[in-house]
Amino acid sequence: MRIIVAGGDGFCGWPTALYLSKQGHEVTIVDNLVRRKYDAELRSNSVTPIATLDERVAKWKELTGKEIKTFIGDLNHYDFLSEVFRQTEPEAFVHFAEQRSAPYSMIDREHAVYTQSNNVIGNLNVLFAIKEHAPDCHLIKLGTMGEYGAPNIDIEEGYIEIEHKGRKDRLPYPKQPGSFYHLSKVHDSHNIMFACKIWGIRATDLNQGIVYGLHTDETELDPVLYNRVDYDGVFGTALNRFLIQSAIGHDLTVYGAGGQTRAFLNIKDTVRCIEIAANNPADKGEFRVFNQFTEYFSVKDLAERVQRVAGEMGLSANIAHIENPRIEAEEHYYHAVNTNLRDLGLEPNLLTDDVLKGILQVALEYKDRVIEENVLPTVSWK
């Protein structure tokens, strides 16, 4: 299958491109390399050293004999995107190419506007490119479980059956996003659903949980293929931050009470979910939603697990509750449905102590690269 991976230089996109290439697909990466520029802007970095995209794809070809084509450019530039479609004739378009950080979107007006314009307009361009150049192409779009928020009822997969004043209907599940970033994903979902209805586009919206882990079988082949490990208060997840904090002897900083509960999955499951969606495409005109996660944990749960694992590795990790920079419920109900991908064959890789120890070991190996002041939050929602 001819597959474009947009955002293929990023944390989810890079291992996905390698995995799909290994499975025999003809993979093309489209990326504007802006994720690397965010590091410069924020004076941050990945704990693991990251090779250039050219070095990465060259090493992959050297090791496997498989070629991954690359196009460097922005989805917001429609002429560029159209040319990519004309040259590659994609059968599937995997869309990771969006600004993905809630804190980044909340820095100030400029970052909020950038996040919304970059994400929403880029996604609209993809929809028009499919319509005009590859109408049978299957859009596999990375959404987020954060679109739903934390409602006091079970979270269904995209749609909900409701009864109101004696009438019933199946409607899109209500959205309660918690940042301008999450709002951009909601706008994307609405635009994709509309395009499917009027143009007959086939699309799968993958509402992904928070991704953890470092290596897939492919990235582990050589240090040049290593994936990112972000730990700062803008792009780092709570789990990564706790692991890096324990590696450098810093308190594990839990925001507020720590009862905030979110969905999670291993990076190995991310790449497998993309493959499942590609091999089982949506029907023409269908807007399909899968909740892409395997487990959920509270922030406090994660801190306690990291504390215990760190202790087993001879590290002392103290848990400290700090003021929450976000506007969010710190204790709430959370139960979400995730049956569609399992029904199609997903066999989850769960968050085990061995997984935590593996990431922590890498953090210890590269702890001299950690910029200590970046492990604390710098962005406030208030």
Question: Whereabouts are the PLM-identified features?
Answer:
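Short-chain dehydrogenase/reductase
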Residues: 123, 127, 192, 239, ...
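Pocket-edge positions in alpha/beta enzyme catalytic cores
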Residues: 73, 85, 115, 227-234, ...
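A short C-terminal helix-loop "cap" of Rossmann-like NAD(P)-dependent dehydrogenase/epimerase domains
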Residues: 54-66, 160-171, 211, 215-217, ...
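N-terminal Rossmann-like NAD(P)+-binding domain of SDR-like oxidoreductases, especially those catalyzing
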Residues: 1-214, 381
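C-terminal substrate-binding subdomain of Rossmann-fold SDR/epimerase-dehydratase oxidoreductases
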Residues: 22, 246-382
